[in-house]
């Protein structure tokens, strides 16, 4: 029960300064606490407060179990005071295989991940399964099937206008995916593009693998940036990466066209060579026929009674 001697506003202010894992545990204190912490008003305040403190969330899948690692505020990767960080798992979660099929033994399996306002979004590009989960509560739900198109990128975001989560099938800005692995210590490297620095983050609980095959097969790392920012899709600066990607696609198309033209030229040259060979064969064949006819005629003239 909330003490009457402590103002409710003060309790909420204290709660806003606590980590999400503590908030999840406090739901079990009492029905009154659970009701207060479950209100949309508190959730919005908590997420707004968290958005002012840039953090990183690492999701690592190992043998079907998802482990979520949250980077504390005082260990921000943008702080140059330390070159190496150590973090432990904050949440563990496992999807029920009889409800959501998201895993396969294929090494070519690709899983797209996004994060928005406390929820994580997983998209299996092979089976086209989309799942939204809350790592704090362990609850998750699958999204209905959506037709996908070639070269599609799927993102998940929060619309602050109507307070609804939406899946974005079109994007305004894309980030580069980089993977760094070691056999001795399991680490993730975070790049601060503005400062041109690289931060080393060590993940506890994932030691050295016995076999290289198990290492690459059972461990996949995904990085989520917990950052909220108003984006103007018409701003050229925000569309630089997309324009660069479009330029790269145009260059690739031009290269493909050049390759096709070269192949066509090679085919034309080969066709001309074949026609030339056929003409030569025809001429040689004609010569052979003439020579053979002349030989038979001479033989007949020399021995007409034969």
UniProtKB/Swiss-Prot annotation:
Which PANTHER family does the record associate with it?
BNAA05G37150D PROTEIN-RELATED, F-BOX ASSOCIATED UBIQUITINATION EFFECTOR FAMILY PROTEIN
Which parts of the sequence are annotated with region: Disordered? 235-278
Acidic residues composition bias: which ranges? 242-270
User: Signal peptide: which range, if any?
Assistant: none
Database matches in Gene3D superfamilies: 1.20.1280.50
> Which SUPFAM superfamilies is this protein grouped with?
F-box domain
- Name of the protein this chain belongs to: Putative F-box protein At1g47300
> Where do the F-box domain residues begin and end?
1-45
Q: Where are the transmembrane segments?
A: none
Q: Which domain of life is it from?
A: Eukaryota
